Amino acid sequence: MKYDPMKDHRLDPRLRQALALMGQLSGSDEPIIDVPDRETQLAEANSPGGVARREMMEKMFGAMDNIVVAPKEGLRIERHTIESAPDGNRINLSVIRPDTNEVLPCVYYIHGGGMMTLSCMFGTYQTWGRMIAHQGLAVVMVDFRNCLTPSSVPEVEPFPAGLNDCVSGFLWTHQNAASMGIDPSRILIAGESGGGNLSIATTMVLGRDGHGDKQLGLYAMCPYISGQWPREDYPSSAENDGIFITIGNNHGAMAYGMEELEAGNPLAWPHFATIEDLKDFPPTMVSVNECDPLRDEGIAFYRKLLEAGVSAQCRQVMGTAHGAELFCSTVPDISRVTARDIRGWVDQCAE
């Protein structure tokens, strides 16, 4: 039976209406089936139909730029293009901060899209970035190489390209903190969905490579980390599948590199992280959404952090679907509460 958001009374009524409208705009009731290989997936993404769907999505996310709920006034917004290691490719960073001379803590933000799609330059992310910046924070958003469709950079590459870009962007931010009015001792990594995956993986790489002391903390929202669904140990992966996102297929793993899932690589899919992988993590907040198929894997990851001796907390945002905080125009109050919670977590990590 097709999911009808208007009949799901767990959801905030505003999100019910928004999800119903998005379902109408998608114009397709066809089930999402597995793809045989990455080449087929790329060909479909670049077919006329795939390009049309991508353009529609980009238009929709662009239209979500809202200067009422997150004004540009009082902020300084810049873009930097930097070189990423080890490939020497170029990536873009969007920097949003209060227009003052004050040295501020920073949120290094990694956008969602399942590591496959989207861009931090889209209106919905720019609005979210401004909302966070209005909490008295500098925000650096990284546009890494997606693995299926381009962000603001043209290259499309599987794992570990996007992760390398996220690590490079963080290290550049730390090295250039003074020129941006950022306190290098107070840089927190955050991200939602695929960006939650990459924020966790970036934290692992920084620790592995001796840069863990450069990271203040971690704020992982609705992390997309197990790579294969549904899972009996994560009931929400079946109960909530189809609510905004559909995960019961192999698209994410195939696009990112199926061999990484089959090998249980925790840098690609942090569900596989061991206690040893996590024991040196900085203070971590995991934020999950009640009606998200990924809810239970986020909660399980939080519990694993506790087992590893990490200072960790978990919050559940009731009445919301996957990544609902990014719907700043639809539920600005919910978005703002999470933006304030990010600020609060920065302050708590700095104590």
Task: Identify the function of each model-found stretch.
Residues 53, 64-65:
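A detector of tandem-repeat and repeat-rich interaction/domain scaffolds
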Residues 60-61:
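Predominantly extracellular/secreted and cell-surface proteins with exposed
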Residues 1-48, 65-351:
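Alpha/beta-hydrolase superfamily serine-hydrolase fold, recognizing
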Residues 48-55:
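Alpha-helix boundary/N-cap detector
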